[in-house]
Amino acid sequence: MKKLAALLLLAASTSAFAAPPKAAAPKPDSDQFAIESTVLAVYNVISGPAGRRDWDRFEALFAPGARLVSTKRGEGGVITANVMTPQEYRAKATTYFNDNGFFEHPVNTHVDVFSDIAHVFTTYESRHSSSDDKPFARGINSFQLVRIGDDWKVLTIFWEEEDAKHPIPAQYLPKR
């Protein structure tokens, strides 16, 4: 009897400390799946070895009036924001992407949806080559999307790169 009680206690205590089950992947017909697919399409278009990008596909992912906002911490820690249309981003990024490999991918994603609006917070890592062990940059992309007809379109991408004084908080890093 004591052995049985000890085994039950051991089983209960190890299951209490076991990792929680992973969340199920979104169903292909769900809004979350469509939203995450749109966000991943943005990452896929801008990522690749040095060379051309599919800018028509990139622009098709955005809603009319969409904006991309990059932030940079300057002297004294003051943040500046560079607001661009998708076309302005394309003009600024084309030369860099033609000459340099750039691979950016999300390592953690959080999606919130209400009716026809969505917010996606992705922690990203950037590499010059898909074979690079360590990223040259990490940060957070904040995507806002809107449902237009049957499609989810990007309305805003707002991002900030981490730095020594502003590391990515643990809650936005991949769960280990």
Model-based region annotation:
Residues 79-82, 131-134, 164-171:
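A short, polar/proline- and glycine-enriched secondary-structure boundary/capping micro-motif
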Residues 18-61, 173-176:
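Short, low-complexity N-terminal intrinsically disordered segments enriched in polar/charged residues
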Residues 67-68, 80-131:
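Surface-exposed, charged secondary-structure patches
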Residues 50-78:
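N-terminal, post-signal-peptide region of Sec/Tat-exported proteins
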Residues 42, 58, 66, 120, ...:
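Hydrophobic pocket/interface hotspot
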Residues 19, 119, 138-167:
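Short beta-strand edge/turn micro-motifs at domain boundaries
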Residues 10-18:
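Hydrophobic h-region of N-terminal signal peptides that target proteins for export
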Residues 1-4:
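Positively charged n-region of N-terminal signal peptides that target proteins for export
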